[in-house]
């Protein structure tokens, strides 16, 4: 597993590194406005893609057991059902995308609307639909513990085509060709996935029989997917509507950095997730809860580390990377840091929940979506971008840090609300002590004179190392953290 994590980490860093250059040249040669439009398209398509309804997660979960038991008949039935689902979804997505085309000007605060935007939109739509060519293979290989193969194919294809896109941006300055490269990338991935499938999965056969178990989980996961869309894919649309498309482009540059951090987190999660499903199916609640606490305390550590370093370093990074005129104010960055923290610490709870097959808590995503949308719109009208981000924070605290953990503790671990208060109360104390100590210790090292990459690298290394060491010392107050150190560090010595 360590090898898989390291390989995944290297690929993630490489993709992100190329992505930073890609974003910089995009702004320089094509413009911040087109970048904003592109990011807006991505969020629109996420909403239209709601018709996917969480089939991917439900299908992966459904395949774990038959693959482990070598029940190839059941695997064939489930895969046939997946293919049927996604063929229908592709057609529905195309029709919805065409119907949504006339509404594009309503969401874009532009001085003039260029008709080429409609063409860009249709191509972006086709790009999303083309991913359904190979989605069943991704689901199958992931459930069969072949995630690293999926990662290889997707990563190397993306890296090659990212480089092509940068060349096109600089030499031709064409957004149209930029999108066509995305389509070609998906086609190449499909070919490689298809080859691997034909060589290694000859035991899977075509069948008209359908797996009915997916319907229940899909209905429940639909609400989780809808809530995720509203929480994670509303900000840019609201910023475009209430602020400007240029601010969308600027905020998207910050999001690119946050996405890199999220990808680093997902590197670990993507390797753990399939193994977690098997562990839960073979162990009792107490063992599962013990594992949850061990992993969760590590992600609390990472959440504070990432969010504090991001708050301290991101504006200087943006200034050196694309220019000081694209920097957001410090309070906005503070709010971004809070969201990053919650986004990091939530992933373990969500993964234990999904691996346990706990999908029927539809009240959680509905509540989260309503709170997020209402507060984001209300505060967005009053406070602009800061209000929109605050709306997301309010829903995250209410549902993700309070309501949902209580449900998971009860359903997945057989623990009551007192145990939740005890554990999360301890986390809150650790957070408060950590921030207090970090504010004191890092204060003498804060700089305002970052003018080059060398300056930033030295500054970032200093802040990151100090933050990591301070957090390590503070987290020794936690029993679960101490046990991890004893078992995985001291025993090896």
Q: Positions of the model-derived regions?
A:
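Alpha-helical transmembrane segments of multi-pass membrane transport and lipid-handling proteins
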Residues: 81-110, 163-170, 191, 289-343, ...
């Amino acid at each position: 597993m360590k090898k898989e994590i390291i390989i995944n980490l290297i690929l993630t860093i490489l993709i992100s590194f190329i992505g930073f250059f890609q974003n910089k040249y995009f702004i320089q040669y094509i413009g911040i406005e087109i970048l904003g439009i592109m990011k807006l398209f991505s969020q629109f398509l996420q909403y239209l893609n709601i018709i996917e309804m969480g089939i991917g997660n439900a299908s992966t979960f459904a395949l774990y057991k038959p693959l482990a038991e070598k029940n190839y008949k059941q695997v064939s039935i489930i895969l046939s059902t997946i293919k049927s689902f996604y063929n229908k979804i592709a057609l529905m997505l195309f029709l919805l995308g065409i119907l949504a085309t006339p509404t594009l000007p309503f969401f874009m605060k532009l001085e003039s609307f260029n008709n080429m935007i409609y063409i860009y939109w249709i191509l972006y739509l086709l790009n999303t639909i083309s991913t359904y060519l190979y989605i069943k293979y991704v689901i199958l290989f992931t459930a069969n513990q072949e995630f690293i193969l999926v990662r290889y194919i997707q990563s190397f294809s993306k890296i090659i085509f990212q480089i092509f896109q940068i060349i096109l941006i600089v030499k031709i300055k064409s957004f149209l060709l930029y999108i066509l490269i995305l389509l070609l990338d998906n086609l190449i991935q499909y070919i490689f996935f298809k080859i691997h499938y034909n060589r290694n999965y000859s035991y899977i056969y075509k069948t008209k029989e359908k797996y009915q178990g997916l319907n229940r989980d899909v209905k429940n996961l639909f609400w989780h997917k809808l809530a995720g869309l509203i929480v994670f894919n509303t900000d840019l649309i609201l910023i475009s509507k209430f602020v400007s498309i240029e601010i969308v482009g600027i905020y998207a540059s910050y999001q690119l950095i946050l996405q890199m951090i999220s990808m680093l987190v997902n590197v670990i999660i993507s390797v753990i997730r399939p193994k977690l499903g098997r562990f839960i199916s073979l162990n009792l609640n107490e063992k599962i809860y013990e594992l949850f606490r061990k992993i969760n305390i590590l992600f609390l550590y990472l959440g504070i580390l990432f969010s504090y370093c991001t708050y301290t370093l991101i504006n200087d990074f943006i200034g050196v990377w694309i220019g000081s005129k694209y920097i957001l104010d410090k309070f906005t960055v503070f709010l971004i840091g809070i969201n990053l923290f919650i986004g990091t610490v939530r992933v373990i709870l969500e993964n234990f929940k999904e691996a346990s097959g706990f999908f029927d808590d539809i009240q959680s995503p509905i509540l989260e979506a309503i709170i997020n949308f209402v507060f984001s719109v209300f505060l967005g009208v009053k406070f602009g971008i800061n209000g929109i981000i605050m709306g997301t924070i309010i829903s995250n605290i209410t549902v993700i840090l309070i309501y949902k953990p209580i449900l998971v503790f009860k359903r997945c671990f057989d623990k009551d609300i007192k145990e939740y208060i005890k554990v999360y109360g301890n986390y809150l104390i650790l957070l408060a002590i950590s921030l207090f100590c970090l504010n004191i210790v890092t204060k003498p090292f804060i700089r305002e004179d970052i003018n080059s990459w060398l300056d930033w690298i030295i500054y970032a290394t200093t802040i990151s190392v100090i933050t990591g060491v301070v957090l390590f010392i503070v987290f020794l107050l936690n029993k679960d953290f101490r046990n991890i150190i004893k078992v995985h560090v001291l025993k090896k010595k």
